[in-house]
Amino acid sequence: MAQFVYTMHRVGKVVPPKRHILKNISLSFFPGAKIGVLGLNGAGKSTLLRIMAGLDKDIEGEARPQPGIKIGYLPQEPQLNPEHTVRESIEEAVSEVVNALKRLDEVYALYADPDADFDKLAAEQGRLEEIIQAHDGHNLNVQLERAADALRLPDWDAKVEKLSGGERRRVALCRLLLEKPDMLLLDEPTNHLDAESVAWLERFLHDFEGTVVAITHDRYFLDNVAGWILELDRGEGIPWEGNYSSWLEQKDQRLAQEASAEAARRKSIEKELEWVRQGAKGRQSKGKARLARFEELNSVEYQKRNETNELFIPPGPRLGDKVIEVSNLRKSYGDRVLIDDLSFSVPKGAIVGIIGPNGAGKSTLFRMMSGQEQPDSGTITLGETVKLASVDQFRDAMDNSKTVWEEVSGGLDIMKIGNTEMPSRAYVGRFNFKGVDQGKRVGELSGGERGRLHLAKLLQVGGNVLLLDEPTNDLDIETLRALENALLEFPGCATVISHDRWFLDRIATHILDYQDEGKVEFFEGNFTEYEEYKKRTLGAEALEPKRIKYKRIAK
């Protein structure tokens, strides 16, 4: 095999208005290397993968794979044939084997014809069996079922045109992995995957013999899979040998050598690095420490000391002892039971991470908590002092023609944030929109910038209990870190739907896990502690992802 599978020489990319999004990148990729791509939103990460996939040829320099190298590319919005079923879409990846199996059946049938050319049939049979044997084709159904379970695909006979965006991405990812290319280019492969499916994907890619280049903000994924980090910083591609934790160490040392302009960013990195260095036992005590610090977080003096946060969550009124109590809750849609007899109590100071497969009913629980929907039976009781602030996952309901400042402020110079007033430009700046960035049109923002804007709009009510539905989607690692730090220092409670395990390990004091047939489990501890508990009580198989089973309403 060649020393490198892919080479880039002085690659640059200019986007309007004459901005060098990538410049002078020269890289060579080793066979079998696992590379995680990091960079702020808008740094050119997706552009880099499109160039490597051969889809963007309007570039400076040269980017090419070695002859004979098969490249597989997963874009953020993959294209599938809308007329196909899920099964037909997946079988496209193994069409050679599917066709060989089909033809082999026909060959067997032809042996029954006494006038057949048996020598010719035997030769064809041998060729077909060679193809099938090379791909373990006789176990094809088992392979497909295993992959479909691991990525929680919809039913085999579901039409692609009826699938959600997340379901289509999972089908496209499954198809790509089954193709077994020499080099995988993955743009946010963990998006729309629950935590168990991400863990399965980690193991798959760790054992994958080819080269992997993945854009992802899932830091456990980067820790467990990546042997290199490629950082895109102001157009340059900087390779770092090691995984994410190693990159944090190296990055901290590099920032220490740079000027004080990076001081705030370095402080945020050091907070996360301190958590990384603590080890499992230290991390597990973090959630308990948060509960103990609740009164300090509530103090006015602490809030004043904390005004330099990169991302600001406005504090609400002081929270009393009673927060949220759920008793014997049941909720169904059609003939599917989403929640069956759920009871739990959210203690003061808690941050509850909500996990489970897509479509299990996590967002439905939020809508019931906020009164938008009613349960079939049971109760949700909010404490008298509770003021909710909800952030949904739908970021499209923004006016693309407005500037960032206009979208948040409504044109007002002074905004009411909770029970206080503050200059609108100062408030918008607390969400990392500084100076000229406040004049950007909403339609020009990256996915991560839209996420920050969405938070700024919906958090201004100043709640003391936050309902955050997938707040980490599309955020770059810098913003994720800032959100984690802001939540840890927020003087209230939060319930957060997320599949980001690193995020959940850093912030969660409790886990609410949606399982099969309407069962939901409430656990005190963070995500890793919960996984250890499941493995200890139910065995290792409990951590393997499976397609969700819905309990049916008895007729």
Each language-model region and where it sits:
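ABC ATP-binding cassette signature C-motif
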Residues: 1-263, 307, 313-555
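Intracellular alpha-helical coupling/juxtamembrane segments of multi-pass membrane proteins
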Residues: 250-293, 297-304
